[in-house]
């Protein structure tokens, strides 16, 4: 996410969207703000045409960059037990984090919650990449905490769960 737009462009986009700069990387929130501002800035609705053009350019560039980051990578392979285990339905709460705080502190190869699966995927992808994984390129809980500078607490987990819940399964790269 940090390579999608340069610093000046990202600040300008967040200002145009009317969002706090700390929300950079929260794609669902940015999308809602973009759609709202499109109505406000649209020239046919009496809005500012220049702001509309600039916002469209920056948002499109950000969106294209995120799509590029979401291209499938063909890193490590999954064995049959992992594929079968991930298809089980453990329930809504256990789906995100089966055991707090154990899953948040240490990866468990036997756990099938999203927190552990995304951390395992992070570790596998890290082996095949030169540059570090960052939020939106990787949706694991650790990348989320590092990107937004958040502590390891249940409140942070709830924020992460909310964003993961609004993210398509394909984008999670599981």
UniProtKB/Swiss-Prot annotation:
The modification N-acetylmethionine is found at residue 1. It is found in: Host cytoplasm; Host nucleus. Keywords: Acetylation, Activator, Early protein, Eukaryotic host gene expression shutoff by virus, Eukaryotic host translation shutoff by virus, Host cytoplasm, Host gene expression shutoff by virus, Host nucleus, Host-virus interaction, Metal-binding, Oncogene, Phosphoprotein, Transcription, Transcription regulation, Zinc, Zinc-finger. GO terms for molecular function: zinc ion binding. GO terms for cellular component: host cell cytoplasm; host cell nucleus. The keyword Acetylation applies. A zinc finger (C4-type) spans 103-116. Residues 12-75 form the J domain. One of its GO terms (biological process) is symbiont-mediated suppression of host gene expression. A zinc finger (H1C3-type) spans 122-143. Interacts with host PPP2R1A; the interaction inhibits PP2A activity. The common region of SV40 ST, 17kT and LT proteins comprises the J domain. This domain is essential for multiple viral activities, including virion assembly, viral DNA replication, transformation and transcriptional activation. This domain is also required for cyclin A-transactivating activity of ST. Promotes efficient viral genome replication by accelerating both G1 and S phase progression of the cell cycle. Inhibits host PP2A by binding to the A subunit, thereby displacing lower affinity regulatory B subunit. Inactivation of PP2A in turn results in the transactivation of cyclin A and cyclin D1 promoters. Late during the infection cycle, ST may induce dephosphorylation of host eIF4E-binding protein EIF4EBP1 leading to the inhibition of cap-dependent translation. May establish and maintain high levels of viral genomes during persistent infection in cell culture. This is Small t antigen.
């Amino acid at each position: 996410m940090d390579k999608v737009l340069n610093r000046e462009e990202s600040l300008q986009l967040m200002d145009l969207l009317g969002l706090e700069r700390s929300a950079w990387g929260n794609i669902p929130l940015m999308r809602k703000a973009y759609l709202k501002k499109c109505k406000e800035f649209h020239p046919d609705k009496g809005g500012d045409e220049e702001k509309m053009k600039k916002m469209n350019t920056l948002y499109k560039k950000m969106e294209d960059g995120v799509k590029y980051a979401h291209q499938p990578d063909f890193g490590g392979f999954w064995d049959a037990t992992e594929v079968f285990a991930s298809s089980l339905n453990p329930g809504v709460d256990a789906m995100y984090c089966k055991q707090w705080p154990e899953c948040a502190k240490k990866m468990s190869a036997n756990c099938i919650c999203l927190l552990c699966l995304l951390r395992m995927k992070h570790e596998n992808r890290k082996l095949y990449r030169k540059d570090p994984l960052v939020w939106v390129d990787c949706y694991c809980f650790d990348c989320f905490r590092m990107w937004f500078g958040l502590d390891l607490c249940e409140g942070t987990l709830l924020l992460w769960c909310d964003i993961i819940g609004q993210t398509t399964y394909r984008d999670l790269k599981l």
